[in-house]
Amino acid sequence: MRPGTGAERGGLMVSEMESHPPSQGPGDGERRLSGSSLCSGSWVSADGFLRRRPSMGHPGMHYAPMGMHPMGQRANMPPVPHGMMPQMMPPMGGPPMGQMPGMMSSVMPGMMMSHMSQASMQPALPPGVNSMDVAAGTASGAKSMWTEHKSPDGRTYYYNTETKQSTWEKPDDLKTPAEQLLSKCPWKEYKSDSGKPYYYNSQTKESRWAKPKELEDLEGYQNTIVAGSLITKSNLHAMIKAEESSKQEECTTTSTAPVPTTEIPTTMSTMAAAEAAAAVVAAAAAAAAAAAAANANASTSASNTVSGTVPVVPEPEVTSIVATVVDNENTVTISTEEQAQLTSTPAIQDQSVEVSSNTGEETSKQETVADFTPKKEEEESQPAKKTYTWNTKEEAKQAFKELLKEKRVPSNASWEQAMKMIINDPRYSALAKLSEKKQAFNAYKVQTEKEEKEEARSKYKEAKESFQRFLENHEKMTSTTRYKKAEQMFGEMEVWNAISERDRLEIYEDVLFFLSKKEKEQAKQLRKRNWEALKNILDNMANVTYSTTWSEAQQYLMDNPTFAEDEELQNMDKEDALICFEEHIRALEKEEEEEKQKSLLRERRRQRKNRESFQIFLDELHEHGQLHSMSSWMELYPTISSDIRFTNMLGQPGSTALDLFKFYVEDLKARYHDEKKIIKDILKDKGFVVEVNTTFEDFVAIISSTKRSTTLDAGNIKLAFNSLLEKAEAREREREKEEARKMKRKESAFKSMLKQAAPPIELDAVWEDIRERFVKEPAFEDITLESERKRIFKDFMHVLEHECQHHHSKNKKHSKKSKKHHRKRSRSRSGSDSDDDDSHSKKKRQRSESRSASEHSSSAESERSYKKSKKHKKKSKKRRHKSDSPESDAEREKDKKEKDRESEKDRTRQRSESKHKSPKKKTGKDSGNWDTSGSELSEGELEKRRRTLLEQLDDDQ
């Protein structure tokens, strides 16, 4: 190849892009060169190099894009972005990531497809220097997915036809090379609320009012790039000729593995920038020489090509304004599988790499380098190979993330920008698929952005804390200092300007609140100190007592030297001093009251001790048997009164000696039931039973024979004996009663035997005559004594004789009484019919099987009225017997009226009840005789009952 091939290639791409705009077909990353000067199989790829399609047909033949779908029609008006970035704050993230087409293997053998847009991989370049990548990105044949639009208010926004998203920021695909250089600068320009521009560094999170030098230099480079021309037409023809001369060697090449080459940056010069162009040409010659040396090394190391490892020399990266640094210290280990992919789809890197195994091509490249031979050539030794192994995909992903972290890839970097920083590292190939790399890169960006935000937040928080501490600790700051005054004092300080106005106001208010609280706390401490000092002075003054007044205390304080020397104490609030004195006096009063209480407690304790001593004295009397539950005060008074403990009890309030004695005896009596159980247990164990004839001495001897009797009270033992003796007597009486009942039952059985004798016993019978008839009867055998049998027989005969006499007399009495009652009934009945009619009506009622409900009610009412009239008669008779005075006549008259009223009420009640109870009224004789028949029926029933009662009385007699 001839010198200037790289420049010619770049010029070919740019000029062809200008003369032939990209078609509306699918953007496959490559563009066919349509010109008479181009050879028939030539092809310009997205990386800016002239390539040949293998197995290329006739130049006029066009191949349809493989595996690509046509782009859909774009909407007329895409949506406007939802919001705007705040002017005071820099953008939180980087520009939108450029869309990178996926890596596709070509369908036709040998067809080469570009992996991604070259426009998104622009390196940072010095002023006046442009690379093949910049030119290739500008001349990309693929149609951009971003379109430019205007919002209703005239602002420009950009719409992505593929993702359907819109943004205010210009995407990388639409940026010029100069704009891309500016976008990579960490310094961005923003405007404050007042419209004043300021500059913010997205990496260091620093903001300043003055324009940074880096940004000024890049803006100067942009003006130079716009003014210069990219390449001339002669360079384009030279590159085409170089491609034609190497066409034969490329067609015969079977290996498509890339050989390390160096992309030669070209200079864009204007008529005013001739010196800059000369410098760029010299730099291009040096880079070409380095590429030739690398090609020579690659041709001699055939074993590397066979084993699948090819050393790659990266493109020089510009890191300063005046020089470029070539980083060729890293090697990339490529597997055999990746080599196979590279044959069909070459990987797009920040440096354009091309490998040729043809010896002739190497010779032509060496000749090209010979034309640009520098003054001094240095032999670079082959870099040491370093291989990495990853057992799992997680380890590979982690290694890829560590690579990003090690290279310090910022969170707002795009994928193209990140590739420039990491592609030369062997760990870049840890993940085989591009999607996996992008996924890991996105995860790294999210994590890094989170860490950067957290770091920025912590720094800002630290700045706020420093500002707050500064205000809180400054001696000129008080709770009454105004913000404007503080701004005049501290406005020029860095700590004042480190935070925003809004946060500064909030912190200032918090500081004022803190200072106010602090001042109050100090005043409180001073008040507490004065309080304690005054309290100590009052405590040490012996002449101040609980009865001292405030005026007296003030005079004492003025005479006190400690109070006179303390100025703060003299400036103490008078109200606080008075309150302190009042509390001191209350404390003295409390001490005086406590002393009185203590003396009272001592006196009460002495009285309690006297009572306890007397209680012990009573215990001693009980142990000696002199005091028990049946003791009395009068019996023991001579013994008790002679003891000193009784004398100490005299005259003291509370319980007296007599009260304690009674309580003691009551306690002994309360123990009776428990001790009685113990006594019963002792008797049960001994098998002793208290009988009627048991003496107390025998009982005591049995009880005292066991150890359990030592705690028993003598009085309770006596009471228990009396109780057991009473129970014994009760048992004896019950036994006698039971024997009497048994004897009575036997007598009854014997009498029953005599009464049921067949034939019956005559009244003149003798016991000896009839005895043999009952000898074998059980009732006869139950009574063992013959005298008892004779006695029972005599009693039986006497009863039999009495019953016989009573039976004869009863018949006579019955006839007389019946006549008497018959006469009385005929006289007392008024307004009724004759006795024959009465008996006839009674027989009629008796024969009737059913009576109506009205007849029952009328008979019941008539019976009730009869009883009332009889009752009134008895009352009137009593009154008549009690008194015969004129007052008795008046009472009789009253009774008569009351009787008439009651009889009238009874009649009306009977009529109303008969009306309500009878379902139908009867006509004729029945309805007229209703009440009369009812009254007659009731009188007949009453007479019948009277007769029955009289007969029962006669039978009883």
From Swiss-Prot:
Cross-referenced Pfam families: FF, FF_PRPF40A, WW
InterPro entries reported in the protein's UniProt record? FF_domain, FF_domain_sf, Prp40-like, WW_dom, WW_dom_sf
Modified-residue entries (Phosphothreonine), positions? T345, T373, T932
Q: Name one GO biological process term.
A: cytoskeleton organization
> Which CDD domains does the entry link to?
WW
Enumerate composition-biased segments (Basic and acidic residues): 883-916
Q: Which PROSITE patterns did the record assign?
A: FF (PS51676), WW_DOMAIN_1 (PS01159), WW_DOMAIN_2 (PS50020)
Positions with biased composition (Low complexity): 252-262
Where the record annotates domain WW, the positions are: 140-173, 181-214
Tissue-level expression reads: Expressed in the brain cortex (at protein level). Widely expressed.
UniProt note: domains: The WW domains are essential for localization to nuclear speckles.
Function, as annotated, reads:
Binds to WASL/N-WASP and suppresses its translocation from the nucleus to the cytoplasm, thereby inhibiting its cytoplasmic function. Plays a role in the regulation of cell morphology and cytoskeletal organization. Required in the control of cell shape and migration. May play a role in cytokinesis. May be involved in pre-mRNA splicing.
Family affiliation: Belongs to the PRPF40 family.
Name by which UniProt lists this protein: Pre-mRNA-processing factor 40 homolog A
Query: Which gene is this protein's source?
Result: PRPF40A
